[in-house]
Structures are given as C-alpha cells and as structure tokens.
Amino acid sequence: DYFGPVTVAAVYVSSEKIQLLKELGIKDSKMLTDEKMLLIADNIKAACPHSILVLRNEKYNAVQQKGWSQGKIKALLHNKALLHVLNKISPTVPEYILIDQFAERDVYYRHIQNEKEIVRDNVLFSTKAEQLHIAVAAASILARVAFLKEMDNISNEMNMEIPKGASKKVDEIAAKILLTNGENVLKTI
C-alpha cells in the first residue's frame, strides 16, 4: 500500500481458545472481507491476549531516511509485539511462536540484533503461516483492522477517500495531495 501505516499484531491463542476462534470464523485473512474482519476483530481482542502496533507514515519515512529497510522495520515491530504478548501472558510460556515469514530467520535476527530484548525461544517461521495456525490468522485480522481504521482516519483528515493498495487511482490521489497540500503532508499519510 502506498498510503497508510505499517501494522503488526501478535496474538496468543491457548489450546482452550482454538475452538472458540474457529466458531467465530477466524481464518486466513485473505479469505475474509474487510467488513467481516471489522466484525470479528473485537471478539479476538476480548478472547485472546494480543498486541497491535501501528507505525504511521511520518515515523516510517523518518526511519527509512536513516537507512532502515522495510524488512528491518517489520522485524523490529514483530519483536516488540511478541514481547508485549509474552509479558501479558507471563508466567505462561507458549509451546511455540509462529511468525508469518517475511524474511529468512537469520536476516530477521540480524535486523533486531541490537535490541535489548529479543524473542528467540521456540520461534518458528513459515510462509503462509495464516493457513497453519489460527493465532497467525487472528493476528493478521487484527493488523488489517488496525490498518483499515487508520486509513479511515487519514481519509477523514484529508476530507477525501484515500484508496488502499497501489494503482493509477492511488497515483492520481497522491499527485492531487502533493499539489494541494504539499510534500510534507503527503509524507504523513
């Protein structure tokens, strides 16, 4: 997406909650509409310890100018979200932590090597992890809903519908904002 923040979520699903989440319709977010995700997100939040992090564009652009890649940004956010959830569920220790893989394991850990606390124990990485475990599906739904809500906020602030994704329409809206409001405003959305 050209507009909007980077959102990351982590969810702890105990074995007792798996069936409940299935009954709520939690599954791979690519198989759900935005409307359905908006309806079930609060149920996930009520049922499971979670963390949702939103990195708005202004901050995203600032750290990118420092030379941080999108992979590094996502790794830092994932590590922080996992730490939040582990603190919430302590002293419980999850059997394993599954990360929907966006970078190879060694690259992920290289990105976060300078952090004070790094989640390493029982961490697994897999592509298409949403299809493997309901906790990843739940986290993806929470991250998507946080993104959608932030996009609504941006649209309200700009007094126009800000499109999602990347397309000719997105380019046209970006050009309109640049001409009307300037580069500094464009960088914040």
Question: Across the structure, where does each feature detected by a protein language model lie?
Answer:
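RNase H-like, Mg2+-dependent phosphodiesterase core
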Residues: 1-189
